Swiss-Prot record:
Taxonomic superkingdom: Bacteria
Region listing for Domain II, in residue ranges: 65-143
Keyword DNA damage: yes
Name of one Pfam family that matches: RuvA_N
Keyword tags: Cytoplasm, DNA damage, DNA recombination, DNA repair, DNA-binding
Region feature Disordered, mapped onto this chain: 150-181
GO cellular component terms, semicolon-separated: cytoplasm; Holliday junction helicase complex; Holliday junction resolvase complex
Species annotation: Cereibacter sphaeroides (strain ATCC 17025 / ATH 2.4.3) (Rhodobacter sphaeroides)
GO molecular function: ATP binding; four-way junction DNA binding; four-way junction helicase activity
Protein name: Holliday junction branch migration complex subunit RuvA
Spans annotated as Domain III: 171-224
Role of this protein: The RuvA-RuvB-RuvC complex processes Holliday junction (HJ) DNA during genetic recombination and DNA repair, while the RuvA-RuvB complex plays an important role in the rescue of blocked DNA replication forks via replication fork reversal (RFR). RuvA specifically binds to HJ cruciform DNA, conferring on it an open structure. The RuvB hexamer acts as an ATP-dependent pump, pulling dsDNA into and through the RuvAB complex. HJ branch migration allows RuvC to scan DNA until it finds its consensus sequence, where it cleaves and resolves the cruciform DNA.
Entries under InterPro entries matching the protein: DNA_helicase_Holl-junc_RuvA_I (IPR013849), Hlx-hairpin-Hlx_DNA-bd_motif (IPR003583), NA-bd_OB-fold (IPR012340), RuvA (IPR000085), RuvA_2-like (IPR010994), RuvA_C (IPR011114), RuvA_C_sf (IPR036267)
Organism taxonomic ancestry: Bacteria, Pseudomonadati, Pseudomonadota, Alphaproteobacteria, Rhodobacterales
Localization annotation: Cytoplasm
Length: 224
């Protein structure tokens, strides 16, 4: 499994790029959004990748973030959504937009992707709505982008640190923080997100981050 490619951008096509990794060129299919973010040929680039295997075809699909890759993988679990349709949805909405549309049951936004009809858009929302909050939590903790590494340098040994005596935050604080981070990543104002998460946490103090996100989204829906 090829999970990440880092090298020099050699060529940009209409729906793919060619990345030179120490003399070996890899064709990586990307969304319109990812293609627009690519640097000029000759510059360093890195993409998280998913290898899609068919009976007579092997294709690499590339993503600038790990959360985008995970959303693509999840979209392909829906009947009627292949690798290219998943890329079209991500290209039209981005990972945050997909998470928002699915969480709010907004099939019309999913349908805005080229080649995605109303039946498939509705199926995406219905089948993935319960899974969206978990990926949203991951999005709040995942690194922003894949870093291009052309040459590796040896690392110096890290200095020893004294054991921390600071107490770890309680689990509830971690859950509310993760939920707040996920909602702000979706574009909600921090004050609105904090108020919704606080209310959701008060209604269900034992809720984990995914449950808090689901409850907060219901509270925020009338404002969007």
């Amino acid at each position: 499994m090829i999970g990440k490619i880092s090298g020099i951008l050699d060529f940009r096509g209409p729906d793919h790029v060619l990345i030179d990794v120490r003399g070996v060129g890899y064709i990586v299919h990307v969304s319109d959004r990812t293609l627009a973010a690519m640097p000029a040929p000759g510059e360093g680039v890195a993409l998280y990748t998913e290898l899609v295997v068919r009976e007579d075809l092997l294709q690499l699909f590339g993503f600038t973030t790990m959360i985008e890759k995970e959303w693509h993988r999840l979209l392909m679990t829906v009947q009627g959504v292949g690798a290219k349709a998943g890329m079209a949805i991500l290209g039209a909405l981005g990972a945050e937009g997909v998470a928002r549309a699915i969480s709010l049951g907004d099939a019309r936004s999913i349908q805005a992707a080229p080649g995605v009809g109303p039946k498939i858009a509705q199926r995406v929302v219905l089948e993935l709505k319960s899974k969206a909050p978990a990926l949203m939590v991951m999005g709040g903790a995942a690194p922003a982008r894949a870093a291009a590494v052309v040459e590796e340098t040896p690392e110096e040994p890290a200095p020893r640190r004294k054991p921390s005596t600071r107490a770890a935050p309680p689990p509830a604080a971690n859950h509310t923080g993760d939920a707040l981070s996920a909602l702000t990543n979706l574009g909600y104002q921090p004050s609105d997100a904090a108020q919704a998460v606080a209310q959701a946490s008060g209604d269900n103090p034992q809720a984990d981050a995914a449950a808090l996100i689901r409850a907060a989204l219901k509270l925020l829906a009338p404002r969007s």
